[in-house]
Amino acid sequence: MCYWIVWPFRQRYDNTTTTDATGSGKTFLACALGHQACRNGMRVLYVRAPRLFEELTLCHADGSFRKRLAAIAKINVLIIDDFAIAPIGPRERNDLLELIDDRVGSRSCIVTSQLPIEDWHDYIGDPTQKRPATAKC
């Protein structure tokens, strides 16, 4: 449960994932949670996973990756929509690990995906990194 929805004064940072088929309301639910977080005075960022990885790739190219990562780390609730909808490479895998690792215990994350959670390990692909990233969501 995301306690910041019910008790915004609690300094607890919960994460949640929602997986189901297209059109089942995952994005609607994630955005509703984000909207409530905004009403409770929290900063929220909604981003589709493919766009996030594209943006971070551009940040690598222009040298602003660390700055962007720091900015995302300050967001109270990060909503990553459509996770695992497109293949990722080693760079995206590392970016995901850094992004999630920066948020553990200090900020909340909501992830939506059509891919069941038990298949995320295969999607992420690198056996040295797949456990920490998915365990923290």
Predicted feature residues:
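Walker B motif beta-strand of ABC-family P-loop ATPases
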Residues: V77
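Hydrophobic helix-cap positions at the C-terminus of alpha-helices
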Residues: W7, Q36-A37, D102-R103
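Walker A/P-loop
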Residues: T19-M42
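Phosphate-binding P-loop
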Residues: V6-Y13
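Conserved beta-strand position immediately N-terminal to the Walker
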Residues: T16
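N-terminal pre-Walker A segment at the start of P-loop NTPase domains
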Residues: M1-I5
